[in-house]
Regions:
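Cys/His-rich Zn2+-binding cysteine-cluster or related metal-binding knuckle/ribbon modules and their
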Residues: 1-12
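Structured secondary-structure scaffolds
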Residues: 3, 17-239, 281-285
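Short, glycine- and charge-enriched coil/turn segments that flank and shape catalytic ligand pockets
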Residues: 14-16, 50-51, 91, 114-123, ...
């Protein structure tokens, strides 16, 4: 298969086409050197069994096990029909097969077997290789076998993520069925697009992209839930206390559920992140955001604000809202870094208050911090109008 630069036997083809990309294949015959990958079949299976998390997600591991058990073929490592590339040192008629060259770069770029770089001992073995599912075979069969042959340690984990599909098929520049990410980022902001991609699709699986799903996710999660919570919280602090909460506060048993969720959020978030379950990690954050919005309805701060004797209680309610934002703000910063910074500015939190360590503690910011209202971070958009705009080829 020319686009994939892969060699296949007739038995490996799927309906006579490339099993990876579905494209046409061509019969080819040329002199080549081979790496005896088949020698490592049993050793690879044993390694998978002893290191069950080596290939992620688990469905990908099952695919690789099945591939080996049907008969692992030796790997062609040189070409004579291609002139560009690195020459085989002992036979200049041959150039090194591009994937052998590419895979070896993981260690040679760190200094393995050369005097140019000196970071091999520091950085190898890698904690994780993050690759597309279409090149998983190279990273979990050929590459580990090469490392075994060199008596070198394997990377700790290889994660093969799925494709983002459009109209049921893989996006392809050659087919013209692609979504312009620059256009989306210019229109909605890179944070919103990044959030959608990681929240909408379980990482590692296939996911369908539609303009409607993008806009609905932005409107529901970012504009309605997070954006509205930020706007309401800061505006009430400004309205009732001039932007600065007093030190005197009055807690109530109805605060306990929300405070408990805020305090336990970081541990739940970390658990999902460690498993590369980014969708679940963000879901945990937005559970707290949703509960905080419900807490506003339960405590009715607008009613408390009308009674001077309940100012301390009002201060406590608003403080809990700001605490929720302070804790929920930095956790999604790997997905939405500018948004985390903007939230910090509006709720009057310092860099230390918004550090990654701070979500593990409740009651961090001082009472005297000043909050100020800013422009909507995620403006709500009209679904029909936005879809028409996105589907307009001249827009």
């Amino acid at each position: 298969c020319k686009p994939c630069e892969s060699w296949w036997t007739e038995a490996q083809l799927k309906d006579g086409k490339c099993p990876d990309c579905g494209g046409p294949v061509y019969e080819a015959e040329e002199e080549a050197y081979f790496f005896k990958t088949s020698k490592y079949a049993d050793r690879l299976l044993k390694y998978y069994d002893e290191h069950p998390d080596f290939i992620q997600p688990a469905t990908r591991k099952n695919e690789m096990i099945a591939f080996i058990k049907q008969g692992l073929q030796d790997t062609c490592v040189s070409r004579t029909s291609v002139s560009w590339g690195i020459q085989v040192p002992f036979d200049p008629k041959h150039t090194i097969y591009v994937w052998i060259d590419a895979l070896s770069n993981y260690i040679t770029a760190l200094g393995y077997d050369n005097d140019t770089y000196h970071d091999f001992d520091k950085y190898w073995p890698a904690d994780i290789h993050m690759v597309g599912k279409e090149i998983l075979r190279f990273h979990t069969l050929i590459w580990p076998a090469m490392l075994m042959a060199l008596d070198l340690p394997l990377p700790t984990k290889v994660f093969g993520h799925g494709w983002l599909l459009l109209n049921g098929g893989k996006m392809s520049k050659s087919k013209g069925n692609v979504v312009d990410p620059v256009k989306l980022c210019d229109r909605y902001g890179v944070d919103a697009v990044r959030y959608f991609l990681l929240r909408e699709v379980p990482f590692g699986n296939e996911g369908a992209f539609t303009n409607e799903a993008l806009i609905n996710r932005i409107n529901t999660d970012l504009a309605n839930d997070l954006g509205n919570l930020l706007s309401r919280s800061v505006s009430m602090v400004e309205k009732y206390f001039g932007g600065t909460l007093p030190a005197e506060r009055e807690a109530d048993p109805m605060d306990e559920e929300l405070v408990g969720m805020i305090s336990s959020l970081r541990a739940k978030y970390e658990e999902q992140m460690e498993q590369y379950a980014f969708q679940n990690a963000l879901t945990e954050v937005f559970k707290v955001i949703s509960r905080t919005n419900k807490y506003i309805d339960e405590t009715a701060p607008w009613a408390l604000g009308k009674d001077e004797s309940k100012k301390a209680r009002l201060a406590s309610v608003l403080y809990n809202l700001l605490e929720s934002l302070r804790v929920c703000g930095p956790l999604p910063s790997p997905f939405m870094p500018p948004s985390a910074e903007k939230i910090a500015e509006q709720i009057g939190a310092s860099k230390e208050d918004m550090s990654y360590e701070s979500p593990g503690r409740h009651g961090v910011p001082p009472a005297g911090a000043t909050r100020h209202q800013g422009p909507p971070r995620f403006p709500r958009t009209a679904l029909t109008k936005e879809i028409a705009q996105l589907e307009d080829p001249h827009a």
